[in-house]
């Protein structure tokens, strides 16, 4: 069973009301008046404590052998840099024994110039690169590259190709992912998936085109194609 890391742990904003009371009270007074707080608003110890509590919260699944991977999905403003690499390494240190999978939403990580560096960095720290299929043509678009950086686990997330809705303001997450893959589009991934399966012990294919029954139907189609 996979889990996405809590927003603040991957530099996303969060509503202060969602924080534990003692963590919220540790924030500077000016931060408490905001509707959204970011990691920069937290004392370092408070953010580390959030990581610790997240880790403890997953312990029952960990002990029962039912914890899959923790998804570290970084936002579109999280560009490649030394500081942001250190941020990822810090997450690795604070979640030391878990399988961590990294998904980028900023294209700089997988640009032609930086791609090899990014994949080598993830491999060095035992992190799974999350390959994605998503709308192309946006500054943040990640190319549909299948890559294995951890020989235990590879992941592909299919977000759909609804370019019209992808960045349109005011839409729900489900509306952004409102897309049904054609047979031809799924077939594009078959050789990539088979190659990944030769490099990683486990390959997870996750349909995130979660609008109506589209994810379920496409998952069944892809499973049938793979035999």
Predicted features and spans:
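Residues lining hydrophobic/aromatic ligand-binding pockets adjacent to catalytic sites
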Residues: 2-227
